[in-house]
Amino acid sequence: MKRYLLTILLSLWCACAWAAGSVTVKGRVLCGGRGVEGVWVSDGEEFACTDKRGNYRLQAGADNRFVFVCVPAGYDAPVEKGVVRYFHPLPADGKSCDFTLLRRAGDDSRYGFIAIADPQIWAPKEFAKLAAAADDIAATVRSYGGMPFHGICCGDIVSHDHSLYGRYNEVMERTGITFRNAMGNHDMKVYGRSYETSFSKFEQMYGPVYYSFDVGRIHYVVLDDNFFIGRDYFYIGYLEERQMRWLEKDLARVQPGSTVVVCLHIPSTCEEQDRKQFRYDRAGSTMTNHRGLYEILKPYRAHIISGHTLSLIHISEPTRHAQI
């Protein structure tokens, strides 16, 4: 009897401890006022899928910062002042958190994709060059006669002056297409005490530093491999375990053999040598633990697009890696 009672008490203690570290988030994913079925919602750790009425219920980690929708093919998220609004701050326990999607006009199985990297805007006078580039992108989009496009900036949006994010967003709206963003090392909040202090400015403007979405038959993933080491402005290329675990769960719903495009800032590799042998003096140039990422991506037709080096390199098998 004592053993039975002890088992019950331990079970209750474990349940309470687990509940104390989590919050229940519930809500709906809507399009035109109607629920959308089969949409995945995440807190950066766990996932939940909407039912026929668009309802979801997610047991989220209490220390997570956002809840966000993985925008499915055929849909867009609203864009406000150049920012894609697919996320909300993590609400209090039991509070409702709804998302609105917009139905894409026509078929999105054939579309254009534009990737840029390293604008590194450090002063207002730099925006003239960015505006010229945005106008060039807009002209390119128009030349395709109405084909839908979307774009991603692979990090280093600004050069540590986060007050310039708003103006960057305004200029990029001139492209006429939705631009999402990955975080770069120049987007970090530096001189903090740990990695966890480095992404607050980016998140205040753009939301989660890692997320996913679908366009047509392609699954896109954006990751943050800029690992601030808590000293001055120094960093290494490193993908934390938290993101790898989330990525494994995210890809579990993607059919093996499908095309997956991963966008991040620091390249996973630049040459054959860095895939064979680690060098301390190159720890900030490439992702030091890229093998773990490659293993996760192995079942898919994976392409990795990055920035950071201000050069153009294309590496095919075995990594299918494009670096901007």
Label the predicted regions.
Residues 310-324:
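Residue-level detector of conserved catalytic or cofactor/ligand-binding positions
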Residues 72-79, 86-91, 162-256, 279-281, ...:
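Extended active-site neighborhood of metal-dependent phosphoesterases/phosphodiesterases
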